[in-house]
Each structure stands twice: as C-alpha cells, then as structure tokens.
C-alpha cells in the first residue's frame, strides 16, 4: 500500500507545481520487485520524508529516489523545505534525507548539523561540483581579460545597467542559497552590485535574454546542470579557495575580510540522512548508501525539466526507464 502526500514545490520557474506521483509501467515495476530481494523485507510503514527545493536536478533526483523506494514497498512523502534549514530538519528527524548536499552552497549548514548530531553523512555522489560567478562565451568578446576576476572588475562598466548605475550588474542565486556575493564584492573591492535572482529559472531567463543580441552578462551558475550544454561558458577565476576563507579574515588576499576567494573548484555532492533512518528503514537506507549519480546524469535530469519541459515526476520516470542499468545494481546490492 502506498502512502503519499505531496506539497507543491515553490519554484516559480519552469519546474511548476508537481503533479501526483505516477507509478512505473507494469513491466518495469514487476521486474524490479521480482529481482530485488529488498522488496520482500520489512521497513517501517511510516513514510520516508524527502525534501523538495528550488532547482530542477534536486527535484527530479528526489522523485527518482522516491519512486525507487515506493517500488520497494516503502511509503514516501515529499515536502517543500528551505534548502539551508533542511539540515536541521534532517537532524531532528522531521525530514529523512537530503540527496544534494552541495559543498559550496550548503557545506556550512551541513557541517553545523553534523556537529550537533542526529544527521549522518551517507557518502558522495560520483559528481564533482562547482558553484560560482559565470559568463556565456560571447561575454568574453566585450571583456577579453576573462576569466580573471581582476579583468572582470576592470570591465565593470560593460555590465552596468539602469538598475546598477555605473556599477556592473551580477545576478546571484536566490537569497536562501547563501552565496555571499555581496560579501565577496566588498572584500575584493569590486565595482559591482549584486542582485539576487528569485529562482534558478530567473538565472536561465537572464542568459536566454542576453543571447539574442550577445549582451555581456555575469550570473551565478553551477555544474552539473543542463546549462553547460546549451550555453558554453566559463567560471570567473577568483583567488583560489582555501579552507577558512569563510571563517578567518587572515585566510585569503584581504586580511580584513571573509569571502575574499572563490568557491571550491572541485566541490563534493553528498547525501545525508537522519541518524535513525538505518534502524527504521534498513532496506531503503542500504539502497541510499549505494546511490551515486554522475555529472552527466544530473545534467540530464535537469534538462528533462528545464529544456524538455516535463513535469518532475514524469522526468524521473523517463530517467529511470532509460537508465535501468544504472539503478538496478543499487537494488540488487
């Protein structure tokens, strides 16, 4: 029996509102249940609570894993949560797991929760992440010194708008992603004004609007996602990330400021879980420890929603049907 309660995602972008979860095709479901011995073992009948945030890969990945759990006979519930506060929710057991712990955006919140206890590190995905200031390649024509951040600052006037006056405009991620763009601008003495996008969709809209006339833009971006295949571009190279850059002013080029360096260029993408998950849902937890996605797989998940305009649950079903050779070994152990 399936128990499912859905709370719609609040992303105003192309992800839209999530529809009711759909089951796999009968053939696929039968194959999973027949070949997966985990399905016969008893996990708790209480639902595993999976959080939904405001970017597409996380929403689709959550649906992918949720559908796998449901086909194992485990109930699943999706809830919309803040992407920073979720680690406290996992720690307290209000949310069961988190599938995309990005080092640059959420590492600090994750570490703080680990120190308090109640949350466990369930391991890394194969994916390597980067999150930072980024520009499409046509921007380099207007600012040929890129990707050096000093060259970007020298070109600030190229990025000025009516909104920012004589300062360059940088479109950062949503406020809850805590990217500290304003602190970096101040720490490095940059002639830029930081504007926060309301959603991931607003970032893609900014790039798309600039593409027609090849207007130079600099925005927050990350990898993996679909954008790298649609708009070739580069990350701005800031002073290299050093541990402590966000905590100790002595670390980094400005001895009086924090956040005076770039984000990690080879960041982790982790999974986290409530420490009680293994005892309450041992079979599902065992599968979670084996789940690992690559950069191309995560980019494809985002593309199904952001480019192909599928609903997240439909995108998850399509991804699972096309990648049975990837996820079946997670079930078989």
From Swiss-Prot:
Induction remark: Expression is induced by TMAO.
Binding-site residues, Ca(2+): 249, 251, 254, 257, 260
Entries under CDD domains matching the protein: PBP2_BCP_2
Transmembrane segments: none
Disruption phenotype: Mutant shows significant reduced growth on TMAO as a sole nitrogen source. Growth on trimethylamine (TMA), glycine betaine (GBT), choline and carnitine is unaffected.
Effect ascribed to mutating residue 131 to A: Nearly complete abrogation of the TMAO-binding affinity
Superkingdom as given in the UniProt entry: Bacteria
Effect of residue 177 to F: Significant decrease in the TMAO-binding affinity
Signal peptide location: 1-42
Regulation: Binds a Ca(2+) ion, which has little effect on either the binding affinity or the secondary structure, but plays an important role in maintaining the stability of TmoX. It may modulate the protein stability in response to biological needs and environmental changes. Thermostability is dramatically decreased when Ca(2+) is removed by EDTA.
GO CC term, one of those recorded: periplasmic space
Main location: periplasm
Record Pfam families: OpuAC (PF04069)
Gene Ontology terms, MF aspect: metal ion binding; transmembrane transporter activity
Entries under InterPro entries matching the protein: ABC_Gly_betaine_transp_sub-bd
Localization per Swiss-Prot or TrEMBL: Periplasm
Residue sites binding trimethylamine N-oxide per the record: 55, 102, 131, 177, 222
Entry keyword set: Calcium, Metal-binding, Periplasm, Signal, Transport
Function: Part of the ABC transporter complex TmoXWV involved in trimethylamine N-oxide (TMAO) import. Is specific for TMAO and essential for TMAO metabolism. Binds TMAO with high affinity. In vitro, also presents a high binding affinity for choline, however this transporter seems specific for TMAO and the choline-binding affinity presented by recombinant TmoX may not make physiological sense.
Domain notes: Can alternate between open and closed states for binding TMAO.
Quaternary context: The complex is probably composed of two ATP-binding proteins (TmoW), two transmembrane proteins (TmoV) and a solute-binding protein (TmoX). Monomer in solution, but forms homodimers in crystals.
Protein name, entry field: Trimethylamine N-oxide-binding protein
Organism of this sequence: Ruegeria pomeroyi (strain ATCC 700808 / DSM 15171 / DSS-3)
Gene: tmoX
